[in-house]
Amino acid sequence: MNEHALKNIPLRLYNTAERQKQELKPIKGNHIQLYTCGPTVYHYAHIGNFRTYIFEDLLRRTIQFFGFSITQVMNLTDVDDKTIRGAIAKGITLDEYTKPYKDAFFEDLKTLNIQSAEYYPAATDYIPAMIEMIKVLLDKKVAYKGGDGSIYYAINQFPRYGCLSHLHLEDLQAGASERVAADEYEKEHVADFVLWKSYDSERDGQIYWESPFGLGRPGWHLECSAMAMHLLGETIDIHVGGIDNMFPHHENEIAQSEACSGKKFVNLWMHAEHLVVDQKKMSKSLGNFYTLRDLLNKGFTGIQVRYLLLQTHYKTQLNFTFQGVESVKSSLQRLNDFIQRIYNIQTLQSDGQVDLLVNDALIRFAEALADDLNISSALAAIFDFVREINCLCDVNQVSQKEAETVINLMKKFDTILGVLTFDKREESIPVDLQEAFAKRQQARQEKNWTLSDELRDFIHQRGYLIEDTPQGTRLKKQ
């Protein structure tokens, strides 16, 4: 398996800001700094969230596949409009409200075999860093105090505002007299956005922090800027999230971070498309809102859900159906059965085709991933390889040594997929076949060739072979 050839394949990823694919070139050496938007822990994450997290996991694994080292930060938003409302409604502290959802999120990551990030910062642990950023923005006259006591970002003081979502600042009607205090809003409501939300006892209960600007709490957009810059530096290689994060969240992150540091915040932006259910937007009112736990309760496994969310390109809208999950079962079964078949190869000689097929499959797989994570083409390379090797197995043209190479390639594929099983299964031979085999052995000793042949044919009809080995005669699945 020629892994050296992978070094000559450039990894090209689609940059949302530039609207084109670009070769990944690290800021420092061979190391990638990756910031991925994590959950707002006001509820259990739903399968639409996990579509994005699976994409982020695919990106992380691909970066490593091509030989880069990585530091990944995935934030946990544990203070925002929704978490505060939830805590107040239940009459508990913010931490008491968010902790069960944080714990559940990490359980779900494990269930889906999503690799761990190096850092999972919670917003409430970085309030001092956020306050310091606001001080800098106020000093630079990019932020101001509104009549409601909150601190706002003046978007007309940042000429590049709109660079990510391709809005034109001169066309916007925002200004000091137009502000938005909500964490989430649409493009038609573009306005100066909140950095520090002034405390309101009716709205916020007992949830607030002290600051030089008065009691309150940070705006959602500021949280990610502060955590990203604190943990990864003023300029990072890649920032990733769902397409719904692009505006206003990521747009506002750029404005805050670059105004604060005077440097480019992110070199490459990537966004995953939405997930829909049966071609409809997921919503509780339509009864098509599913968490991972809902799917597990319906009998599906985390690996099946992972494969389903993985197999569609991240820039394509993913249509979730239960028929789709069922089809995934057969795909995984085919791959895992293939692995078991290769484990059972006993042939010592072959015609030498396997090494060529292994190298071709690896290059096809790598080139597909290098083309903006083209997972459908990567999967096609795997299934073509499985078909070709199965054909060789049918005519006993895969040796034991080559079988090891095939297994190693499947393990290499699974560093990306994270769905295969490599535990060798011991076949359980039915009792009646074991009895027939023992009777045949006895018949041969007694030279009862007619009975011996009848029992051999019975065993063959049931899908088993009688194989002679150095350890003696045994039954083997065909």
From Swiss-Prot:
Sequence motif: 'HIGH' region, positions: 39-49
The protein's Enzyme Commission number: 6.1.1.16
Any one GO molecular function term: zinc ion binding
Signal peptide: none
Residues the record lists as binding Zn(2+): C37, C224, H249, E253
Motif residue range(s): 'KMSKS' region: 281-285
Compartmental location: Cytoplasm
UniProt keywords, alphabetically: Aminoacyl-tRNA synthetase, ATP-binding, Cytoplasm, Ligase, Metal-binding, Nucleotide-binding, Protein biosynthesis, Zinc
GO BP terms: cysteinyl-tRNA aminoacylation
The protein's required cofactors: Zn(2+)
GO cellular component labels: cytosol
Pfam family for this entry, one: DALR_2
Catalyzed reaction equations: tRNA(Cys) + L-cysteine + ATP = L-cysteinyl-tRNA(Cys) + AMP + diphosphate
InterPro entries attached to this UniProt entry: Cys-tRNA-ligase (IPR015803), Cys-tRNA-synt_Ia_DALR (IPR015273), Cys-tRNA/MSH_ligase (IPR024909), Rossmann-like_a/b/a_fold (IPR014729), tRNA-synt_1_cat_dom (IPR032678), tRNAsynth_Ia_anticodon-bd (IPR009080)
Annotated HAMAP family: Cys_tRNA_synth (MF_00041)
NCBIfam families, alphabetized: cysS
Quaternary state and interactors: Monomer.
Family: Belongs to the class-I aminoacyl-tRNA synthetase family.
Protein name per the record: Cysteine--tRNA ligase
